[in-house]
């Protein structure tokens, strides 16, 4: 398995490529036409200096791309060269002559050529097989075979069901955490538990987003379901991190990204997660820890984040914010008498709500 950082870059590249060839795009329509006609085809997206080195013969077209043009030109034996954007057909019926010493795991001539050209030029190369009836994408060392839309929809719907289950578990864990925060009983074990729940939900979301990109226009309903299920999930996870990271950080999303880049194996290692949050690996799971209060303060309606920052800066931790009088809150920069009362009442309502939720 590749190292995580390299894997993250690969996923980013694949994500953009899948959007480029997704259903609903002119390129995908043309590719599907070629596939149905059983003619096969080889398409290179981009025409840089490295591509020029491997292209021989053919004829210059330089015309606007259309699915019909691609279909007709694919009837010829040679490869088709598109512009970087895919909006123009530059050359047709060209012969590709990549370096034969470049390794290839493919057996068929078309796919072997496609893989070598992709490695040599760094461009996206698309091989359409008339025998296997599949479309394969190559770029550098990446290879991806496009899947049937029905198959992807099935996988996406299964992932949505899994997401719903994990979201339910996360909600229960968060409700328990809310009550513990008001009671000053949060332990490092609780923090790790919530971190794991957030991360699992976000990983499933990222997997579904890949399906959505590959589905193109067919993935609209799946996208709506994800939005309905986990709106602002990253923002809430980032506030949770700001609450419990040892040293204050300006951008919790950087740390959240590091968490998402971790392998599943590392994520299960408590000491690695501790280190990410700035705590020593020897930290006792049963030790108590106080939240700063970002996440709960953010739940108070119409309380801007700069004001939340000022409150946390003034009092340090959530218990001190809860204990503060309206007069003490009023002294914080940006908070007047009305807003001070609003914070007091907002925290009280949250405390009562979470107490009732826990009783249920």
Swiss-Prot record:
Q: Which family does it belong to?
A: Belongs to the DisA family.
Residue ranges annotated as transmembrane are none
* Biological process annotations from GO: DNA repair
User: What modulates its activity?
Assistant: Diadenylate cyclase (DAC) activity is inhibited 2-fold by Holliday junction (HJ) DNA, further addition of RecG inhibits DAC activity 11-fold; RecG may relocate DisA from the HJ. DAC is inhibited by the interaction with RadA. Diadenylate cyclase activity is not affected by ssDNA or dsDNA, but three- and four-way junctions strongly inhibit the activity of DisA, suggesting the enzyme is regulated by branched nucleic acids.
Could you tell me the EC number(s) of this protein? 2.7.7.85
Task performed by this protein: Participates in a DNA-damage check-point that is active prior to asymmetric division when DNA is damaged. Forms globular foci that rapidly scan along the chromosomes during sporulation, searching for lesions. Its ability to scan through the chromosome rapidly is due to its non-specific DNA-binding. When a lesion is present, DisA pauses at the lesion site. This triggers a cellular response that culminates in a temporary block in sporulation initiation. One of 3 paralogous diadenylate cyclases (DAC) in this bacteria. Has diadenylate cyclase activity, catalyzing the condensation of 2 ATP molecules into cyclic di-AMP (c-di-AMP). c-di-AMP acts as a signaling molecule that couples DNA integrity with progression of sporulation. The rise in c-di-AMP level generated by DisA while scanning the chromosome operates as a positive signal that advances sporulation; upon encountering a lesion, the DisA focus arrests at the damaged site and halts c-di-AMP synthesis. Does not convert GTP to c-di-GMP.
Protein known as: DNA integrity scanning protein DisA
Compartmental location: Cytoplasm
* Organism from which the protein derives: Bacillus subtilis (strain 168)
Q: Name one GO molecular function term.
A: adenylate cyclase activity
Give the induction text: Expression increases during late exponential phase and at the onset of sporulation. Transcribed under partial control of SigM ECF sigma factor.
Task: Name the positions where ATP binds.
Answer: 78, 96, 109-113
**Every DAC domain range:** 11-149
What the record says about its domains?
The C-terminal domain (residues 290-360) is required for DNA binding and to inhibit the ATPase activity of RecG.
Reactions accelerated catalytically: 2 ATP = 3',3'-c-di-AMP + 2 diphosphate
> What does the record give as cofactor?
Mg(2+)
**Whom does it interact with, and what assembly results?**
Homooligomer. Interacts with RadA.
Q: Which domain of life is it from?
A: Bacteria
Q: Does the keyword section mention 4Fe-4S? A: no
Swiss-Prot/TrEMBL keywords: ATP-binding, Cytoplasm, DNA damage, DNA repair, DNA-binding, Magnesium, Nucleotide-binding, Nucleotidyltransferase, Transferase
Q: Name one GO cellular component term.
A: cytoplasm
Q: Which InterPro entries match?
A: DisA, DisA_sf, DNA_integrity_DisA_N_sf, DNA_integrity_scan_DisA_link, DNA_integrity_scan_DisA_N, DNA_integrity_scanning_protein, RuvA_2-like
The consequence of inactivating this gene is:
Decreases c-di-AMP levels in mid-exponential phase from about 3.8 uM to about 2.8 uM in strain BG214. No change in sensitivity to methyl methanesulfonate (MMS), decreased survival after UV irradiation in transition and stationary phase, strong decrease in competence. Cells lacking this gene show a reduced c-di-AMP level compared to wild-type and cannot properly trigger the DNA damage response. No effect on antibiotic sensitivity to the beta-lactam antibiotic cefuroxime (CEF), upon overexpression of the c-di-AMP phosphodiesterase GdpP increased sensitivity to CEF.
